[in-house]
Amino acid sequence: MGDKIVRATAANGGIRLVAVLTTNATREAKKRHGLSYLTSSILGRAFSASLLLASSMKIMHGRVTLRVRSDGPLKGLLVDAGRDGKVRGYVGNPNLELDLVKTKSNKYSFDFTKALGTGYLNIIRDNGFGEPFTSTVELVNGNIAEDLASYLYHSEQTPSAVFIGEKIQNKNLICSGGLLAQVLPKKETDPLLVSLLEDRCKEINSFSEDLFESKDDLLSIIKNIFPDIDDKSISENARTQEVRFECRCSKQRSLNAMKMLDKDELEDILKKEGKAELVCEFCKNKYLINFEEIEEMIKA
């Protein structure tokens, strides 16, 4: 089954619920970037977080950029996600592997805190008009879910709960995804709604296990927490949306990037190499700029 976003509301429209599946997008990123299982999990979590944020944007060409700058061995990450469900991204150290750590439930987990270290989560929301909205918060623990919840609390003052996880079995990524539950802005001061959100979300003991057991049925995950969702609040067409890894790079963008070099640099490339190869950081696609194309830039 393909990746997707599912939307719903509860409490007569007072609580917004969004669930996202990013399994295939994460697998594609793993293949393109040569990611380890640790970095696959981290980037998959960042994919889920970015898409959850982008899902609330009003216009389809709206975009969210999620960047982590930190002192950990991961060396940061960058994700670009659209309201249209398209996502791409990369990490600074794709091959990173660390020892697993034991959790409170005596299970073993990736050491996200050590991988990311201390630093900052930066979120940019771009609606495609006016100045993009930018906000930065300190990392909480590097597991992305709590970091995103901190961003929503400090930057948007919205009571929210964020769950993000994945399941890896027999060296295969089985599933990756997330869930966002938040009191809508007009209801954020309603103590009963805030209490309801807190009580329902306490029922989630392990989102990764819930995601795995759901067999990609995101609506069932939502209904496990809020069985009384508002069925008619969102049209069927708007409720579900496709998600996929897709990059916006192109040969023309590569040519435009080359044109920003001065003529001396272009002549040096032409003399030494006779061509140029540009590699997209987001997807690793390669674009060859040949002798004639570079020569044309110099003459322009």
From Swiss-Prot:
It is found in: Cytoplasm. The gene is hslO. GO terms for biological process: protein refolding. Belongs to the HSP33 family. Under oxidizing conditions two disulfide bonds are formed involving the reactive cysteines. Under reducing conditions zinc is bound to the reactive cysteines and the protein is inactive. The keyword Cytoplasm applies. Keywords: Chaperone, Cytoplasm, Disulfide bond, Redox-active center, Zinc. This is 33 kDa chaperonin. It comes from Prochlorococcus marinus (strain MIT 9515). Disulfide bonds join C247-C249, C280-C283. Redox regulated molecular chaperone. Protects both thermally unfolding and oxidatively damaged proteins from irreversible aggregation. Plays an important role in the bacterial defense system toward oxidative stress.
